[in-house]
Amino acid sequence: MFEYFPTGPYTWNLGVVATLNSGGLIDEMDRACRPIKDAANAGEDAGTPEFLRAWRALTDQLVAQAEDAEKAGHTRTAGQLWFRASNYLAQAERMLAHSDPNRVPTYRRMLEIAQKAFELHSPRVSRVEIPYEGTTLPAYFSAAPATDDGPAPVIVLVNGLDSTKEHMYASNHWEELAARGISCLMLDQPGTGEALRLQGLTARIDTEVWAGAAVDWLEQRDDVDAARIGIVGWSLGGYYAPRAAAFEKRLALCVAWGANHDWGAVQRRRKEREGERPVPHYWEHVLWVWGKDGDEHHLDAFLDFADAVNLDGVVEQITVPFLIAHGANDRQIPLEMAHRSYDQAVNSPKRELRVFTPQEGATEHIGLDHLPYVSTFIADWVADTFAELKR
């Protein structure tokens, strides 16, 4: 993996490479990161304020350029600038601690910038709200061009532990799907993104509940082929999505974009400092996601709870096509988790394990070191599988 900070923290290097592989430009990244090289050596937690300041300054510069371009009537240029500004600020916000007073204001600004990007860069993407247990789940819906001619299949794309629907948007996976005639619902499910930050909706083990709400909403749309609704989850979504597909039988296929078969076991390893962590301020973030704020001094009790975030006895109940895509050198989730999910998915009519090697790239966590490569592989598999299901 390209590591901008040779002696810096994994979390920062992962953030840089993820941003570059989601449409970021290397010159802009260099101008943001060069001033904080010394801060990187101070450690991921201590250096986070400097990271935010540097990346926010880059965002401010792009926003000013976008506004100037828009005033001049150069809407394509403005749209590209809004898109990259959204990408950069999303990554900076991801690094912040839950307790950081900058977190919510930064996220709200990110929402505003993303909306500008939709208007000028991605007009087929729109903000939607999914009814869910007396409230709503925020999401972005990409209507594939194929919907101009009738209903199209759709993928529900779900987050992991620390990503947001804005990261999904920046990844351009929805665009790869759209080019193959497939729409995409980028969902901030409970425990992620806007649902967590602004609505206080925390993660739940029974992911089929919110997945069912998404399917209910999609089935009511005239532009959706209700017989071909699939689910794709990256990172911790490699637990969320298979669990949903096992029990929400209206889902027609499932992809674990990074297997997360036994998340509880991974947490116990992290307590012993085995493996890399995805974000600074890790335990504060994890406890927030699961609604266990304030339990920092009761981590053993949380680890007992986390043991239930496990797909043993679950993937056996998946009865639809199931793809597991995993990097051979994933430093967060060991490859053995992918093999466990594959070996136990005995009732899937089409199960496939795709391991990405160092020789080809996309070998790090969810393929962030070569995100377009794994993204297009998954999009091709989804398109092929939906075509098979239509026959």
Q: Model-predicted segments: where are they?
A:
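Catalytic histidine neighborhood in serine/cysteine hydrolases
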Residues: 342-363
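Primarily recognizes the serine-hydrolase "nucleophile elbow" in alpha/beta-hydrolase
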Residues: 90, 217-272
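Short beta-strand/loop motif that positions the catalytic acidic residue
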Residues: 318-319, 324-326, 330
